[in-house]
C-alpha cells in the first residue's frame, strides 16, 4: 500500500530493515509487535524487493540490513526485481567472528561488479563498543 502512494514517481534511495525470519521458521513470538518485526508474514522479502524495484528510478540505490545466512535469498530477490547487489558490508560481533548481519546496497539496473567493504566489528576484546560503532552511534569520546 505504501508503494501505491508513489505511483508514477521514482525514488533515488529506498532503505529497509525487514523481518529477518522466514514465515514458518524459527521460534514464534507471542507478542504481536515482536512477531511482525522479526518474522515474515505481514510482508515477505520478495514483496519488499518488488516494492523497492518499482519505487526506484534506474540507477537508484536500495539499502537493506539482513541476517548473514539469508544473503543468498536477499541477492536472489533483489536480482529478480532488477536490483543488482553492488556493495556488501558484513557485521561481526567481535574480530574474527563470522558475520551475523549484512548491509547490502543494490542498484536498480546496476550492471556488473560487487564491492566488499571492510567488516564492521561491534565489540572489542573487552566487550566494549569499537571506535567504529561509537562513531556510527555518534558518541563524542571517539
Regions found by a protein language model. Give the residues of each.
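Short acidic/glycine-rich loop or secondary-structure boundary segments that cap or lie
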Residues: 6, 22-28, 60, 72-74
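Residues in well-ordered beta-strands of folded domains
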Residues: 12, 89, 123
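Mobile active-site "lid"/loop adjacent to the S-adenosyl-L-methionine
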Residues: 9, 13, 18-47
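Conserved SAM/SAH-binding loop
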Residues: 1-4
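Phosphate/oxyanion-binding loops and surfaces in catalytic or ligand/nucleic-acid-binding neighborhoods
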Residues: 21, 81, 109
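Conserved Class I SAM-dependent methyltransferase catalytic core
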Residues: 41-99, 103-104
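SAM/dcSAM-binding transferase cores
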Residues: 96-142
Amino acid at each position: 500500500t505504501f508503494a501505491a502512494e508513489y505511483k508514477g514517481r521514482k525514488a533515488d534511495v529506498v532503505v529497509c530493515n525487514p523481518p529477518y525470519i522466514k514465515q514458518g521458521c524459527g521460534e514464534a513470538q507471542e507478542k504481536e509487535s515482536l512477531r511482525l518485526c522479526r518474522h515474515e508474514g505481514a510482508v515477505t522479502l520478495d514483496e519488499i524487493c518488488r516494492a523497492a524495484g518499482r519505487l526506484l528510478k534506474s540507477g537508484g540505490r536500495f539499502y537493506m540490513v539482513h541476517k548473514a545466512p539469508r544473503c543468498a535469498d536477499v541477492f536472489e530477490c533483489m536480482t529478480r526485481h532488477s536490483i543488482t547487489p553492488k556493495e556488501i558490508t558484513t557485521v561481526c560481533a567481535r574480530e574474527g567472528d563470522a558475520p551475523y548481519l549484512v548491509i547490502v546496497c543494490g542498484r536498480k539496473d546496476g550492471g556488473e561488479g560487487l564491492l566488499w567493504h571492510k567488516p564492521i566489528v561491534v565489540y572489542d576484546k573487552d566487550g566494549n563498543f569499537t571506535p567504529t560503532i561509537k562513531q556510527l552511534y555518534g558518541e563524542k569520546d571517539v
